[in-house]
């Protein structure tokens, strides 16, 4: 039995296995960066891969990696799963392309999607900019403050009412 102290090593080894047949000069795996340097790595590449395993944990992940990559001008290629799938379903058809959201886990469709964007780079940048415009609109906190405040106030009222009902049970 082999004991592995770092679970990220398992992930890195899985990624290396998936891409073992590709030229190592064409891609690079990045370790986590400190917060102050986090966005820096997005400026290093044109195409962002946001792959998630198809499991219960990953199904709860948000779409943040896709949104971040769009913010920095990357062409996204991501798993059509979990939060990524929710984001993709909500996006208007005019900004979608089949080589952005990949619904299968096998390497073939991912390699084809990456190859498509390498060969059609300008179209990819244009489509990524359109998707960014959509995501910037729905993720701009300033455009949704009133809705959020209304939601919190409604929940506060419901909570207060529930507390009053609970107290009333003991007062009678």
Where are these regions (language model features)?
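Hydrophobic/aromatic residues located in beta-strands of well-ordered beta-sheets
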Residues: 1-2, 76
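Nucleotide-activated donor-binding/catalytic signature segment of Leloir-type glycosyltransferases, i.e.
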Residues: 3-42
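Structural motif corresponding to alpha-helix initiation and N-cap regions
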Residues: 32-35, 63, 107, 117
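Nucleotide-sugar-dependent
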Residues: 36-43, 48-68, 78-88
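A charged, aromatic-enriched C-terminal amphipathic alpha-helix characteristic of glycosyltransferases
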Residues: 105, 119-166
